[in-house]
Each structure stands twice: as C-alpha cells, then as structure tokens.
Amino acid sequence: MPKPLVYRVQNHAARRLHHDFRLEIGVALKGWAITRGSSLVAGEHRLNVAVEDLVLDYIDFEGVIAMGYHGAVLMLLWDRATGEPDGDCAAALATGSAALTLQGEKLIGRWRLERMKSRLCEEHVSWLLVKSHDAARERGDLDILEEQPRSVLTGRTVKDIAATAA
Ligand code: MN
C-alpha cells in the first residue's frame, strides 16, 4: 500500500485568483497552478502549470506576504487532506501520468494528473488535472468554488484576509 501523500489547495490571489494544487513528493511540496480552479465535475479537464516547489514549512500558510517590488501575495488555505496515490507517485509523475484519490474537505474522489506534450522552448510544463467519473458532480451542478470559497483553516474569505492586511 503506497504511503499517503499530504495534499493542499491554496487559493492564491495574484494578478488573477487561481488555485495552487500541492502534493508532498519527497521533501518538498510539488505545485501546479490551476488557472480556473479545481473542479468536482466528472470528466472535467483543468489546465494546470507546474510551479516552483515549496518547502514543507509553508504547508499550512494562510495570509499575506509582502513581496517588495512585486506587491503582496495573498494565500487562503482552501482544502487539505492526505491523498492516496496509485503506487509510487513520484515515479508516476516522472512518466507523465499519476492517479490519486483525495479525501479532502472539498475535493473528494479520484483525479488524474496528465502531462501534456510540450514544445522544448516552453518555459513551464503544462498538465491536466482530470476528474474521474466517480461520485462526482455533473455539469450544471453548483460549482464547488462558488459553494465553498472559505478557508478550511479559519473560515475566512479572500476578502476577509485582504482586510487584515490593509
Ligand atoms: Mn500560485
């Protein structure tokens, strides 16, 4: 039985609000930025782009970090859980396809991470986060992002967190 992985989703308010999907691989949190956010809709493909690893110390970070010239970064801890990979997740990711089951507070069920074929000149590697046809929602159902926008850590919204930094 593979070792469960720590998994987090942070709502990251940058130029545009997006989700950072994070998985504990080895000693770091691997990350993917999901432009349109996570989805519970069966068969839905969400484009995500690999981003820099994060040290495990920041796993439950929520709040605002001043970034000097670049302004401030706001993070809301949107979901947390352990994920159960089908086998060795690091090895599966290296091959470009990994399946896992999440038991989050918001994201529950099975997903696949699929690496897209990329051109050599591309700076960032694109992946797809694909929701499996398990106990998922259907198209037209309420969007989990609209239904549950609050932090799993503090119950705050992005607006609440922004207000504390003002
Ligand atoms: Mn981000």
What residue ranges belong to the model's regions?
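A charge-rich, low-complexity, intrinsically flexible signal that marks solvent-exposed coils, linkers
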Residues: M1-A166
